[in-house]
């Protein structure tokens, strides 16, 4: 039975894990790392790079290198968060035909789901190369505070990558699974998850294989990227004060600043001071300029203090919804790379009144939890019951633009809820059901998930027709809504497709594109491998020709030299079949040379063997004595 993998699709880094016996194992990628940068780049030659290779070239290609794409997934172009993001990233964010926020490279538009799919494809390949078999099913994690549109877009990304997404699981819940799988006694835990782009807090009761989420809260636009940008702005401002040049207008310099900021942030978690050195960051008429700034941990903490403080309000709200006080939490589990920052740990300790638990790897624990959930779904992990919740209230718009809740936030999922509504006017023959998600009292202030019409209602005075609206949330947190006229039995239902979102036809096209890209990548990799083999053969043949060329006839020598020249010409192109054919031709042409080399080495061995045999008699006695006279030898 094919394995189901667990993928943590992160804002900054992604990670893949699989169940290995009773334990979840994180799989190393082709570069030997346990996490992969969530970065996709397109080069000028139209090559697609994913992960570390994409990150390495970001400085020289900032406009076509997409990072933190998770912040755009499932968002409309007009979303205030997208407006904010446009000011922070060097790449182009554009409005798609459906009103969603997409990105553009070399004139081609890509949806965030497509870019995410490229990262998922890389994780899929990583798992396939480790397992030695095809992988078609996965459990993918999302921030607990993701709304329906963001969850649906993540599921679409999986589909585009050629994966059947068996379950979308919340990141803090996945972390709790990995942390608490072997815990028998009952505990109430808080999972504080501050990652690269999002923040989540979940309160769970765990024990004896049952993981029950009591409440969840968070901020889908708060994470390490924001900490980096604070530092980038500070460095740019300091440089402007000193040199009078504004680096914020130079995309290349900004990308170098971003990389330096990320590195400095990581260093300051373990040391109290670091130095940022960026030679030749820019130049003016007086010559090149260099940036050199010393940064203390205290200074960095003062720059980001409000960002750390922003995590506390969601913690308060989550505790309130769970009906608990901070003192009733038995353990606080830290998840996400940003929780390595001492200031974050100190803030968590002060709020919850206890030292946070640091026994899990904050970068890997979410992927491990996803793998455990995959094991549960596959039947490999027994006696585990996971009860998650919906993070936001769901309802419809009613008369006067009021938001009428049908399902409150923190309701255990899967769940189903119905309520009867009626018409607002006499003889109304159709109603539009507008579905919203959020906590505000007016519908317009919440997130519109989608809308549909129920038509063919028989004419009647207002308030008479009975229209039953049913909300159904599945275990992925994805919503289905139906409306039924109880009088006629007419029913209309929709799987909520975000008011933008990708249509089935678009997803299908993207799946085909992804497959074609995977095929192109495979061909490119194949060509590189064939070239490597060809170059190795050229090198070894040239060396043999130099050493043993005089052992073959002039005609054979010429044939070998011609075959080498033809193969060299073939390796300058990209035709793998042509390179293979010329490699075979050279291998055949150089067989005579190989024979000559073999015969020469045989002759050498034979000569060496005769000498050894000849000298054996004299040497026999020498093994036992240190000194032997010629006279003694004769008398012996």
UniProtKB/Swiss-Prot annotation:
SUPFAM superfamilies: Actin-like ATPase domain, Heat shock protein 70kD (HSP70), C-terminal subdomain, Heat shock protein 70kD (HSP70), peptide-binding domain. The modification Phosphothreonine is found at residue 198. The keyword Nucleotide-binding applies. It comes from the Bacteria. CDD domains: ASKHA_NBD_HSP70_HSPA9. The keyword Signal does not apply. Residues 603-636 are annotated as: Disordered. Pfam families: HSP70 (PF00012). Keywords: ATP-binding, Chaperone, Nucleotide-binding, Phosphoprotein, Stress response. GO terms for molecular function: ATP binding; ATP-dependent protein folding chaperone; unfolded protein binding. NCBIfam families: PRK00290.1, PRK05183.1, prok_dnaK. Acts as a chaperone. This is Chaperone protein DnaK. The gene is dnaK.
């Amino acid at each position: 039975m094919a394995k189901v993998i667990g993928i943590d699709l992160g804002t900054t880094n992604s990670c893949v894990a699989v169940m290995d016996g009773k334990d979840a194992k994180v799989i190393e990628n082709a570069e030997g790392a346990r996490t992969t940068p969530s970065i996709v780049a397109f080069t000028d030659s139209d090559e697609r790079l994913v992960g570390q290779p994409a990150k390495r070239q970001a400085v020289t290609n900032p406009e076509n290198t997409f990072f933190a794409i998770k912040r755009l997934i499932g968002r409309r172009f007009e979303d205030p968060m997208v407006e904010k993001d446009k000011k922070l990233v060097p790449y182009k964010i554009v409005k798609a035909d459906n009103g969603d926020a997409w990105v553009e490279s070399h004139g081609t538009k890509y949806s965030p789901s497509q870019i995410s799919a490229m990262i998922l494809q890389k994780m899929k390949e990583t798992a396939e190369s480790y397992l030695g078999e095809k992988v078609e099913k996965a459990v993918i994690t999302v921030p607990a505070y993701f709304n329906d549109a963001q969850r649906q877009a993540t599921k679409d990304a999986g589909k585009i990558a050629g994966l059947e997404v068996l379950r979308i699981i919340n990141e803090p819940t996945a972390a709790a699974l990995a942390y608490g799988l072997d815990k028998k006694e009952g505990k109430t835990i808080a999972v504080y998850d501050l990652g690269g782009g999002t923040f989540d807090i979940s309160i769970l009761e765990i024990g004896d294989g049952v993981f029950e989420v009591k409440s969840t809260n968070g901020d889908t636009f708060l994470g390490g990227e924001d900490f980096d940008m604070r530092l980038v702005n500070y460095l740019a401002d300091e440089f402007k004060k000193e040199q009078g040049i504004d680096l914020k207008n130079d995309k290349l310099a900004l990308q170098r600043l971003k990389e330096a900021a990320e590195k400095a942030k990581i260093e300051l978690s373990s040391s109290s001071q670091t130095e940022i050195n960026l030679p030749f960051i820019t130049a003016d008429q007086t010559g090149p300029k260099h940036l050199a700034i010393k940064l203390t941990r205290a200074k960095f903490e003062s720059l980001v203090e409000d960002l750390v403080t922003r995590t506390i309000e969601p913690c308060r709200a989550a505790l309130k919804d769970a009906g608990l006080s901070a003192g009733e939490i038995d353990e606080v589990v830290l998840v996400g790379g940003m929780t390595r920052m001492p200031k974050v740990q100190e803030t968590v300790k002060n709020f919850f009144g206890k030292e946070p638990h640091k026994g899990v790897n904050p970068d890997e624990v979410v992927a491990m939890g996803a793998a455990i959930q995959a094991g549960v779904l596959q039947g490999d992990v027994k006696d585990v019951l996971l009860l998650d919740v919906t993070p936001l209230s769901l309802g419809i718009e009613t008369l006067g633009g009021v938001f009428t809740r049908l399902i409150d936030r923190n309701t255990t999922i899967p769940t189903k809820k119905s309520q009867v509504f009626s018409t607002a006017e006499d003889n109304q023959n159709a109603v539009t059901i507008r579905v919203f998600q959020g906590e505000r009292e007016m519908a317009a202030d919440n997130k519109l998930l989608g809308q549909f019409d129920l038509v063919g209602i028989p004419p009647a005075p207002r308030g008479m027709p009975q229209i039953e609206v049913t909300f159904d949330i599945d275990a992925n947190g994805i919503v289905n809504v139906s409306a039924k006229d109880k009088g006629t039995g007419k029913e209309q239902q929709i799987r909520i497709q975000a008011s933008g979102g990708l249509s089935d036809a678009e997803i299908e096209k993207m799946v085909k594109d992804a497959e074609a890209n995977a095929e192109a990548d495979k061909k490119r990799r194949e060509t590189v491998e064939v070239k490597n083999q060809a170059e190795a053969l050229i090198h070894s043949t040239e060396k043999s020709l130099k050493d043993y060329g005089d052992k073959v006839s002039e005609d054979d020598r010429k044939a070998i030299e011609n075959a080498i020249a033809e193969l060299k010409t073939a390796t300058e192109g990209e035709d793998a079949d042509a390179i293979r054919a010329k490699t075979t031709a050279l291998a055949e042409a150089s067989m005579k040379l190989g024979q000559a080399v073999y015969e020469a080495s045989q002759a050498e061995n034979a000569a060496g063997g005769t000498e050894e045999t000849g000298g054996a008699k004299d040497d026999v006695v020498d093994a036992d004595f240190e000194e032997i006279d010629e006279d003694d030898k004769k008398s012996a």
